[in-house]
Design a protein with these regions (language model features):
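Acidic/polar-rich alpha-helix caps and helix-coil junctions
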Residues: 1-188
Length: 188
């Protein structure tokens, strides 16, 4: 049901030179703050958590239908193969294509939504926020968060750093940056 050849190429970064990158970090590629896919995946997760897999599935399939138009990649990768066919509830049943480890169907669905948020949110704040949120309450469906050249068991980054301009000009900002490892109130 899924062919991610084009997305993989779009996300591949040539670290030896900046000028040859024509995908996610191409110099004119938009860096979105809020997106259609993010909103649909929020709706998918919340509908499933507050109801059932069947309640969330249409929202996930909306994202897949949009991706099947090539909306998630730029024109440099439209000629590469991609396919995002709609899921059905059986795909999340024990032994289904999205549940090879036999967890309950709803958890398998939520895990797929979180994985899609992780991949689609590449370069955005979504994976970072999901990592903090799910580590506390739903580690069984969280995407493993690996720090390159960093500790694998903590401390984990808890917040984004404050910009110096924010600290200097915003009267609501703390007197000094507390650092990325200081837990926010919601994560204590």
């Amino acid at each position: 049901k899924t062919d991610e050849t084009a997305r993989k190429a779009y996300y591949t970064i040539n670290s030896s030179t900046g000028s040859s990158n024509s995908g996610i970090i191409e110099e004119n590629e938009p860096q979105n703050m809020v997106t259609y896919f993010e909103n649909q995946l929020i709706l998918a997760e919340s509908a499933a958590r507050n109801g059932s897999l069947a309640d969330g599935l249409p929202y996930l399939n909306n994202v897949r239908a949009w991706m099947n138009t090539g909306g998630h990649i730029n024109s440099n990768f439209q000629d590469q193969s991609y396919s995002y066919l709609a899921y059905d509830a059986a795909d999340f049943d024990n032994g289904g294509i999205e549940n090879t480890d036999g967890i309950d169907s709803k958890s398998a669905f939520l895990r797929e939504v979180i994985e899609e948020r992780y991949v689609s949110g590449f370069g955005m704040h979504i994976p970072y926020n999901d990592s903090r949120r799910l580590r506390k309450s739903d580690s069984s469906i969280a995407v493993p968060y690996v720090l390159v050249n960093g500790p694998q068991s903590g401390p984990w980054p808890e917040r984004m750093p404050y910009a110096t301009t924010e600290l200097n000009s915003n009267s609501n900002a703390p007197a000094e940056d507390p650092g990325i490892f200081t837990k926010t109130r919601v994560n204590q």
